[in-house]
Amino acid sequence: MTGSVSGEEGLSEKAYRLGVEYEKRYHNCAFSTVKALSDALNLGWDWPIDKVYGLAGGVGLTGEGSCGALSGGALILTLLCSPEMRYESISREERYKVYGIVSELAKKFQMEYGGCTCRRVQEKVLGRSFNLWDPEEHEGFVKAGGHEDDKCPSVVGNSAKWVVEILSANNYFEDKRG
């Protein structure tokens, strides 16, 4: 990738746009975030993309865990920013560098949505949270616009955009230019 800040800004907007598009199409925040980033960054990954769907809706649709868009973004940051070695071989300093990078994404969720859980994000963007396991509640989520542009798709778009911005701020693209 040739590198200019404007190119990286273009990548963040592409990641946002793909995140919105994919969440509207697939109705899965974790999958859509990882796929948007894989496609925007030309990672060429099939795995782990197809294996993250269980993280959606606050992990297994419980609402209690991290927002799936946050989980998907955290996964990509960890995969791209970790040293090329097994966990057991990574030094404490290297692990804490990655923890710090991932925490930047969590802080953005806290600032924008008031927290990191699916419930908290739903409350912010939908005005209340929904039990996605209950058919009536799930229908209420859809009727409240859960899959419309300015709701969960925008959360996925923001997460994907923020990941690109965090990668840029941590010289990921500079390192790739060599």
PLM features: residue spans?
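Acidic-glycine-rich active-site phosphate/pyrophosphate-binding loop
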Residues: 3-9, 37-55, 131-136
